[in-house]
Amino acid sequence: MSNQMNTMDIKEILKYLPHRYPFLLIDRVLDYTPGVSLQAIKNVSINEPFFQGHFPIQPVMPGVLILEAMAQATGLLAFKTMSSDVPPPGVLYYFAGIDNARFRRVVEPGDQIHFDVKMIKERRGIGVFYGEAKVDGEVVCSAEIMCARREISQ
């Protein structure tokens, strides 16, 4: 059994996710096991565009963007489960639903968010995942996320 880590740098992430600045919220994948789990990070900088209005005096990363980043990590795991090489042309994973989202503390500039997403099940192109976002080992957000695989015209 190999202890080799499966990682993804930003160049590879860009091949899988359609998101671009300012909405690409995953900086690196630290490890993944197709069909099982994926760990990724987001470095939170004061230069993030959302900090201009949320909130100028006490900058806090919006919770919906923490969930969006978690959903992007989920999409990467779904793609890597489907095909470990390159993403198939004309296929996207859409955010289909969320349950039991909980926020436990704020995320501020200078934090590094570690995402850990686990695949619970997949059936007929609908995947169900559980994710946690942590800063310094402390859970800041957790949720069950659903995504749907769809063919798109190119």
From Swiss-Prot:
Gene3D superfamilies: Hotdog Thioesterase
A biological process term (GO) from this entry: lipid A biosynthetic process
Molecular function terms, GO-annotated: (3R)-hydroxyacyl-[acyl-carrier-protein] dehydratase activity
KW Lipid biosynthesis (keyword) present: yes
Keyword Cytoplasm included in the entry's annotation: yes
InterPro entries: FabA_FabZ, FabZ, HotDog_dom_sf
Record field: catalytic activity: a (3R)-hydroxyacyl-[ACP] = a (2E)-enoyl-[ACP] + H2O
Residues of the active site: H54
Enzyme class (EC, first level): lyase
Domain of life: Bacteria
UniProt entry keywords in alphabetical sequence: Cytoplasm, Lipid A biosynthesis, Lipid biosynthesis, Lipid metabolism, Lyase
GO terms under cellular component: cytoplasm; membrane
E.C. numbers: 4.2.1.59
Localization: Cytoplasm
Family: Belongs to the thioester dehydratase family. FabZ subfamily.
Function: Involved in unsaturated fatty acids biosynthesis. Catalyzes the dehydration of short chain beta-hydroxyacyl-ACPs and long chain saturated and unsaturated beta-hydroxyacyl-ACPs.
Protein name listed in UniProt: 3-hydroxyacyl-[acyl-carrier-protein] dehydratase FabZ
Species, as recorded: Shewanella baltica (strain OS155 / ATCC BAA-1091)
